[in-house]
């Protein structure tokens, strides 16, 4: 559901940068107040895990479409909404700059659509209320599926609203919505099941790692071992499983193709669009998750491993930076 720059007018892009930036600033303040040092490695490893998982497009049968995780609901269940939102920003920023996945002009939109709803609404509407009177396997599955379905529906609807506000006449609003929502309902269901599987593993391994958990049962694995398993899983998913990803267009591309006959629209190539495109051409060392001018599968594997590592470093580094400046001010 990564939007390209051609789908967004500069005014809409600026508005969404302000909205996403405001939430990010508020989240930084909240994260600075947190004192749990174990949250830092979880941010890094789970950021890497979500990055790798987003490389895996799964086929939606009988549609010609595919989908992939957003990851906001998974992260918010582990980190809480504020750290989860900042982690998602790290993932989306690396995808945009290093891999040209999603437009730079549209980054504010993508952060809002893919991170805000999952991290904040997923937490405050589903995760926290459902875990309030105790955590169980059934509640984890229910919250995961409901949270992913609803927040992905909101994200898909926001894409349509942003194209409407941008004056993209090639994508008539009512028809675009009618195409986007059903396919993302299916994608949301699959993401909910995957999210539930990961969270159930954590629940069995280290239940206290889950947000809102008051579990005091004996843990199956140590904290370090649990983090190591998730980290290794991220590397395996990014380096190997990504090779088996579906080549079908994702939900957004599929919807566009149904309406316009193409998975992409051309921007006007001037002004803000041209500037953003020029920047991405310089920063995207591994465009489309591969080496430039090469179809080598090694490029995909390298991108998955390298991207996961960069996201881990960025998330952990940013968190330590927040804490450093907090200590300096105090």
Where are these regions (language model features)?
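Hydrophobic core segments of alpha-helical transmembrane domains in multi-pass membrane transport
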Residues: 16-29, 49-54, 120-125, 148-160, ...
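Hydrophobic transmembrane alpha-helices
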Residues: 2-10, 20-75
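Short helix-perturbing small/polar motifs within transmembrane alpha-helices
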Residues: 115-155
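Alpha-helical membrane segments and adjacent membrane-interface helices in multi-pass membrane proteins
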Residues: 54, 58-118
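Aromatic-rich transmembrane-lumenal/periplasmic boundary elements in polytopic membrane proteins
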Residues: 233-281
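Interfacial loop-to-helix junctions that mark the boundaries of transmembrane helices
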Residues: 1-13, 36, 63-65, 105-110, ...
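Individual transmembrane alpha-helix segments
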Residues: 1-4, 277-316
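Glycine-rich ThDP/TPP pyrophosphate-binding loop and its adjacent helix/strand module
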Residues: 143-150, 158-226
């Amino acid at each position: 559901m990564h939007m390209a720059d051609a789908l967004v007018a500069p005014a809409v892009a600026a508005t969404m940068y302000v909205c996403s930036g405001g939430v990010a600033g508020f989240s930084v303040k909240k994260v600075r107040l947190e004192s749990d040092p174990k949250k830092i490695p979880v941010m890094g490893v789970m950021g890497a895990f979500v990055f790798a998982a987003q490389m895996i497009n799964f086929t939606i049968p009988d549609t010609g479409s595919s989908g992939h995780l957003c990851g906001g609901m998974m992260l918010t269940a582990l980190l809480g909404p504020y750290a989860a939102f900042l982690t998602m920003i790290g993932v989306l920023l690396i995808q945009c700059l290093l891999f040209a996945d999603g437009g730079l002009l549209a980054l504010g939109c993508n952060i809002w659509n893919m991170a805000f709803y999952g991290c904040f609404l997923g937490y405050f509407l589903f995760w926290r209320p459902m875990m309030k009177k105790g955590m169980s396997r059934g509640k984890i599955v229910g919250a995961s599926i409901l949270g992913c379905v609803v927040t992905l529906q909101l994200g898909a609807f926001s894409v349509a609203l942003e194209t409407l506000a941008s004056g993209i006449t090639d994508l008539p609003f009512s028809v675009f919505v009618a195409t986007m929502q059903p396919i993302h309902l299916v994608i949301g269901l699959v993401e909910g099941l995957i999210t539930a599987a990961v969270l159930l593993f954590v629940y069995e391994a280290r239940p206290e790692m889950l947000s809102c958990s008051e579990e005091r049962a004996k843990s199956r694995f140590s904290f370090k071992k649990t983090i190591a398993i998730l980290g290794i899983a991220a590397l395996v998913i990014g380096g190997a499983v990504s090779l088996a990803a579906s080549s079908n267009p994702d939900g957004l591309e599929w919807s566009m193709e149904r309406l316009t006959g193409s998975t992409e629209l051309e921007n006007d190539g001037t002004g803000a669009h041209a500037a953003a495109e020029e920047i991405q051409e310089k920063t995207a060392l591994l465009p489309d998750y591969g080496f430039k001018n090469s179809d080598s599968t090694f490029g995909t594997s390298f991108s998955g491993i390298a991207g996961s590592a960069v996201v881990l470093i960025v998330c952990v580094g940013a968190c330590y930076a927040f804490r450093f400046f907090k200590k300096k001010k105090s």
